[in-house]
Regions:
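Core Rossmann-like FAD-binding/catalytic domain of the broad FAD-dependent monooxygenase superfamily
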Residues: 1-278, 283-287, 366, 436-439
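Helical substrate-recognition/capping region of FAD-dependent monooxygenase/halogenase enzymes
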Residues: 5, 9-14, 146, 214-439
Length: 439
């Protein structure tokens, strides 16, 4: 797993991260100011106390079980085998899906390429078959050979890994429980049918990390962490709903659902309107349009396009090998996008730059100009957009301002802004009371 290797390497190099192998959480107790964990090791048990605990311990989360937290949602009938094999297979890099194959009637098979000549084969088990039966080596080998024969790739292969799983669309009702914050599969369980399993966990972490950092550093109020739960539970519900549709399409739970699915498949190559029924809806990014961190809703509605409050920034190509997000890079903190005309910075925009100059937390001001990049020490950096692509995609004109959270979701925007509005929007985006902002 390259991602895990890269993350582990980063953690090992970071002076503030301590990795403790071979240790298990066996107890958890919360107080008003800290959480105490009971840790079991080969050398005995000890206690570890921290201000906050982030539980990212997977679908079988020990922390979730110790806290007796129950998930809500649905578990679907049917069990599936995932088998990763190493083989030289001459097929393009795309996901192949087969419905009702001759060797596995009434079920389906997924096949797709992974790095280093690894191929993932995923198929549904016949009803009533146990996990032990499904993973019996001789039977598993016959089924993998049947898949390879079906795709006309009867090659030598080696089994890398195999397991059995069930499809679930389950989530906790909230992800923040006192000083314990749950994320990833510890907070929700999603089916694999295009439902962004690991991506959803990364989005959880991206949402939580900056908020926890702001609270720990005293830059934000503790209610900011409640917005993590609000936003990500809503995202989990959306993904569960879409994942449920995909799961019912892949494994119809009733004869009527199967009849509809088969009709869609049979007509899909000739009837264009049916393609929308097979669209991977979860490829759309989630937007936090109902977030309590968004400010100036009335002003946001004045726009006729662009990136609305709650939506993630759009990356715009400015020139060959030059994009808008390149200018933002990996800088931590809030971002202000200020759009200027050929005349450069106006008085209001200069006042906004001055008002955000010495905040306690990091904020980066990016000026977008249609002319050659300006030489202005107040901004970092300045982006030249001679083609006007950013102006068009952001429905911007000279004087337009976008306020962007550290996780790159827009939380306020104005056709014309003044310094007081920007500062008040920053207060709301850092967890201070709602309703403090002008409109």
């Amino acid at each position: 797993q390259y991602i895990e290797e890269y993350l582990l390497g980063y953690c090992q190099r970071h002076p503030l991260i301590d990795i403790r192998w071979g240790q298990r959480v066996v107890a958890i107790a919360q107080g008003d100011a800290a959480v105490t964990l009971g840790i079991d090791t080969p050398d005995g048990e000890y206690e570890l106390t921290a201000e906050w605990v982030v539980a990212a311990d997977g679908g079988r989360s020990t922390v979730r079980k110790l806290m007796q937290l129950r998930m809500e949602g649905r578990s679907y009938p049917g069990r599936f085998v995932i088998a990763d094999i190493k083989a030289k297979i001459d097929l393009p890099t795309e996901r192949l899906c087969f419905f009702d194959p001759a060797w596995n009637p009434g079920n389906n098979v997924l096949v797709h390429r992974q790095p280093d000549d690894l191929w993932r084969i995923d198929f549904r088990l016949p009803d009533g078959e146990t996990e032990e039966q499904a993973l019996e080596p001789a039977l598993l080998k016959r089924r993998i050979n049947a898949v390879l024969s079906m795709i006309k790739q009867e090659v030598e292969w080696q089994l890398d890994w195999a397991t059995v799983y069930s499809a679930n669309t389950l989530t906790l009702g909230k992800f923040v429980h006192g000083r314990v914050l749950l994320t990833g599969d510890a907070a929700h369980l999603l089916p694999i049918f295009g439902v962004r399993g690991i991506n959803t966990g990364l989005q959880d972490s991206n949402n939580l990390a900056w908020k926890l950092a702001f609270v720990i550093n005293g830059w934000a109020e503790r209610p900011l962490l409640d917005s993590y739960s609000q936003e990500r539970v809503q995202a989990a519900h959306e993904i569960c709903e879409e994942g449920g549709k995909s799961t019912r399409f892949m494994t119809p739970p009733s004869p009527g659902t199967r009849l509809l699915r088969d009709a869609v498949l049979s007509w899909s190559l000739s009837e264009d309107f049916l393609k929308d029924l097979m669209h991977w809806r979860t490829s759309r990014p989630h937007d936090y349009r109902d977030s309590s961190l968004n400010a100036f809703a009335e002003v946001d509605r004045e726009f006729h396009g662009g990136v609305a409050c709650g939506q993630p920034l759009r990356n715009i190509k400015l020139a060959a090998n030059d994009h808008l997000l390149d200018a933002i890079g990996s800088k931590a903190g809030f971002h202000l996008l200020l759009f200027v005309g050929k005349e450069g910075l106006t008085g209001d925009l200069r006042e906004i730059l001055a008002a955000t100059e010495n905040l306690a937390y990091p904020i980066h001001r990016l000026i977008v100009t249609p002319a050659a990049p300006l030489d202005d020490p107040q901004a970092d950096p300045i982006v030249g957009d001679a083609q006007g692509r950013t102006y068009s995609k952001y429905d911007a004109s000279p004087g337009t301002v976008y306020l962007v959270r550290p996780d790159l979701h827009v939380c306020a925007r104005w056709r014309r802004a003044n310094p007081l509005q920007v500062v008040q929007a920053l207060r709301q985006a850092t967890g201070f009371a709602e309703g403090c902002c002008l409109s």
